[in-house]
């Protein structure tokens, strides 16, 4: 138990002192990080955690990893008959899952692999999924999902996903 913890911030590092302990962490300027405009994300929509787990787990195994066709390195969300459909392919395998969740008619986004894996990791960390509150929103460039106290903001992959209905 320390009575006080001190943070000292400089341009290149953050020093943390508590009792006899001193930690120095490197710091990067905020201008080195991309600006993500989350103001224009549209309406937040609710989604049950069980539905999101199914959307990810049933299709993500077929997601490409470091493919030159960058649009395959993510999970494609779109709508079919008013329901959210998730599709992944690496060019050899294709997985498609039509959920029971209602989706926007214009929904057609590709969420990057790293964001999908992180969302899946967070969802799997909860022992009782019925207590998990989830809201998502998106625009043409950004996907935003809130899972209880977690907030994930990810750039979307640009490009057109292949027509998987012709396979």
Where are these regions (language model features)?
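Structural preference for solvent-exposed beta-strand-turn elements
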Residues: 1-167
